[in-house]
Amino acid sequence: MPSHTPNGIAHFDVLGPEPDALHEFYSAVFNWKVDPQGPGYALVQTPAGSPDGAVVEAEQAGIVVGIVVQDLDATVAAAEAHGGQVVMPPTDNGWVVKAQVTDPAGNLLSLIGG
């Protein structure tokens, strides 16, 4: 992750049911390096200084934005207090501690403890 700046965008996931088509699209259109890691998951490397991401196989298409936060629990509570919903409580996945919330419109955000 290139950014550990509090409240800065650090990561993104591009979701869709046909990951191979997404790999081809982002490689060809933006010249991003796509590195498959296994079935349904590939790392995406963007130009220096930009957040890196991943292509993730999922039934529904979408983009998930990863935001670094200083206080994960407080940010999750603030999201709930302002109309968001918790999708995944703070969880250590072995790389980072993160939570997932939706904003009032239903957009999914990954909150990354920093």
Q: Which stretches of residues belong to each language-model region?
A:
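Conserved catalytic-core motifs of GNAT/GCN5-like acyltransferases
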Residues: 11, 33-39, 89-91
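Conserved active-site tyrosine of GNAT-family acetyltransferases
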Residues: 22-26, 79, 106
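N-terminal beta-strand motif that seeds the catalytic metal site of vicinal oxygen chelate
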Residues: 1-23, 50-51, 63-67, 112-113
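Residues at alpha-helix termini
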Residues: 28-30, 82
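Vicinal oxygen chelate
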Residues: 1-5, 9-17, 57-82, 84-114
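Conserved short beta-strand elements that form part of the metal-binding/catalytic scaffold
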Residues: 30-63, 108-114
